[in-house]
């Protein structure tokens, strides 16, 4: 349910316009990372992604990219593209929406991937020198404190550079 998470007005602006608008809102910062998060930011042909990412890094004060996606939507060609930006000196973060390390829960919430897929994607990204941040959800149905701690342990073991914890948030119209 993207409408709950994305400003409708932003959806009709160019990447340059969105970045300029957000920079004005947080004008105390001097440098920015362009954050591609809405939808799956790697689910397009590489030339389309290159155009989007290039629009972002060509803006003043943009020093890198944060690209949010699912672990099952990161083919080698996309990892190679992200490496091109890293090799040009940009800071590049691949943010993976894992949610949990428990396959039973991933199946229950219809994620379409398992923990092994996440591990593979993380390993491939880390081998290329990309920074990886994992998004996890606390409070998923059927999971308690023990499962949350197990997820954290398993994710840390993959060598990620960052973890973002989110509470379970059910949005009207999403179920």
Each language-model region and where it sits:
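Core AdoMet radical
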Residues: 2-46, 61-74, 91-117, 162-164
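Distinct, well-ordered alpha-helical segments
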Residues: 46-54, 75-86, 146-148
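Conserved C-terminal portion of the radical SAM core fold
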Residues: 116-174
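Short, surface-exposed connector motifs at secondary-structure boundaries
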Residues: 59-65, 131-134
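Non-catalytic positions within long, well-ordered alpha-helices that form the structural scaffold/packing
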Residues: 57-58, 83, 156
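Active-site-proximal flexible loops/turns
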Residues: 75-77, 102-106, 142, 171-174
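Surface-exposed amphipathic alpha-helices with a cationic face
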Residues: 20, 24, 82-87, 119-127
């Amino acid at each position: 349910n993207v409408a709950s998470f994305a400003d409708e007005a932003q959806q009709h602006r160019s990447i340059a316009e969105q970045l300029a608008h957000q920079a004005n809102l947080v004008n105390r910062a001097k440098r920015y990372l362009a954050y591609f998060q809405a939808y799956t930011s790697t689910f397009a042909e590489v030339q389309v992604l290159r155009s989007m990412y290039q629009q972002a890094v060509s803006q003043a004060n943009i020093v890198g990219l944060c690209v949010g996606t699912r672990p099952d939507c990161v083919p080698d060609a996309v990892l190679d593209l992200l490496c091109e930006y890293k090799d040009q000196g940009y800071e590049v973060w691949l943010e993976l929406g894992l949610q949990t390390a428990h396959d039973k829960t991933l199946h229950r919430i219809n994620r379409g991937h398992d923990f092994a897929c996440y591990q593979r994607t993380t390993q491939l990204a880390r081998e290329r020198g990309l920074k990886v941040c994992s998004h996890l959800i606390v409070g998923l149905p059927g999971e308690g404190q023990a499962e949350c701690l197990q997820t954290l342990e398993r994710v840390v073991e993959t060598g990620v550079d960052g973890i973002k914890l989110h509470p379970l948030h059910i949005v009207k119209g999403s179920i």
